[in-house]
Each structure stands twice: as structure tokens, then as C-alpha cells.
Amino acid sequence: MKIWVVVSINCLDIISLLSLEGIGRKRVGLILKQYRNISLSIKDIYEILKDKNYYFTLKELYQVYEKSKNIIEELNQSKIHMIDCLSTAYPDSLRKIEDPPLLLFIKGYYDFIYNEKNCLAVIGSREPTKKGKKTAYNIARYLARKKFSIISGLALGCDTQAHLACLKEKGRTAAILAHGLNMIYPKENEKLAQDIIDKGGCLISEYLPYEKAKNYTFIERDRLQSALSQAVIVIETEETGGTMHTVRFAKKQNKLLACVQYTPEQMQDYKLSGNKIILNELNAIPVRNYEDLDDLITYLRENKS
């Protein structure tokens, strides 16, 4: 009589299902929702997939599960934390969004991400103007002084300045990555990534350790930057810039949206064309000076509940 390995829907199952060709995150999410409290054997999973018109042999499933066990072992060796969407440790702020990650991989110290009301996303162009680069640094540093944690994406330009400024003030910052945690993109920020970890912050990803960044993963990670934050502050962006994805997610998630408003002359620069849209069409709160920042901070603190 064949004895089937018995498993429950957990990290091992999620990694295995995500590793199967042709099965996306949303389909895996539906399976999790349907069978979350049921212990399943690999044969059960074979039948479930077959019923949903996904045809894999039992041998293929066993091989995938073995590879997934190796991935989990590698995560342990690399000191990467893994939290599945069914865990009580999964952040509530991510449960609320339309398409929550099935898994979170985190490197570093991440207790502060559970306090969404104390986290602010500071984001902007990879190729900002000199003024934009300086503004990103100054705003993030000021917010860190006021004891806010900074969420950003480790990209060159505004993101880099936001992380650096937060660290300068001995604040805590989280970088949301568009790839697995066994690599850093861009390479120029490898040292910054390590500094973030060493100084009490963290790197966060929803992708398997060796998964490379793709165009769509940069967009997907943007929804996490806004979800983990009480508000999103845009420093500088073109109307077609990647920052606009985070802006759209912020609006969809009902997050407070603020945007730097430069002088009328500076606002004519195409690099700020996104700022004009965010301010004029999306009704973002304008940030023109430190007084505006103080007003924003007061509002955020009065609306923490």
C-alpha cells in the first residue's frame, strides 16, 4: 500500500504551486482560499490541479516539492524570513489589498512594518533633477527625524536618497524589491541594501530567492510600497514614469497622496509632468516647504486610528 506524504497548505505548498509552469499567483490564491484548513497529500494536490485542467504527473509534483524543500533550506541559510498569507504574522495592511502577495520574503528586522500608520512611502524618478534629488533626501530626513519609517524601492535616484536620508537620522527603512532576495538590483545599491539591514531595516520581496526582475514585477511591487504606508509622498516623476504605478495603487487603496510642488518655472520641466497630473488631476496634497510637511504630519498623527 502506497503511503502518501501528508502536508497542509503552507509555505512549502505555496512555493511548489508557484513553481509549476502555467499557474499564476491568482490561481494559487484561489486554491489556498478553498483548501486553507484542510490537510492535503501530494496526491490530493495532483487531483485538485487535474480538476482545474492543470495536468502534471505525480513524479513532476514530487520533484517540484523536493526543489521547494531545498529553497526553504536555502532561505534558512541566508537568514531570509518567509511569511505566508495564511499566517498570523502576515501584515494586516497587505490583507486589505485586492491582490495580496501569497508569500513575503524578508531580510533584516521588520517589526516596524506592522505599524502602517508610522510608515511613509517616499518615491520618485530614477533620474531626477538635481533639485529633485536634494528634495528627496531632505524630505525623507525630516520625516525620519519625526520618527516615521521610510518605505521605498531601492531604485537609483529618489528612492536611494530616501533610504540614505533615513539611515542618516538613524531611522528605519524598508526597501520593497521587484526580484528575489538572493540578488540586489541595481548593483550600485548592494552596499546600501546591506546598510539598511545592518541598521535595523529590511528588504522585502514576494518573489522566490533567485527570481529576476521583469518589467511587470516592478509594477507589482509598487502596490506593496503604498499598501505598507499610511501615505505616499511623490518627489518627482514624469507622466509616464514608473512612480505613477504606485500613485494609482495608492488611490485604489485609499491612501493619502502627497506630492512636491516646485516653483511655477520648475514645474514646466517635463521631468515634473507627473507631478502636475498628481497635483491637478488627482488632488494630491501639495508639499512646497517644511510648513506643508508639518501640516501633513499633524494630519497623519491625528488620523492614526
List the predicted regions and their residue ranges.
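Glycine-biased, small-residue-rich flexible motifs in mid-sequence functional cores and linkers
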Residues: 85-305
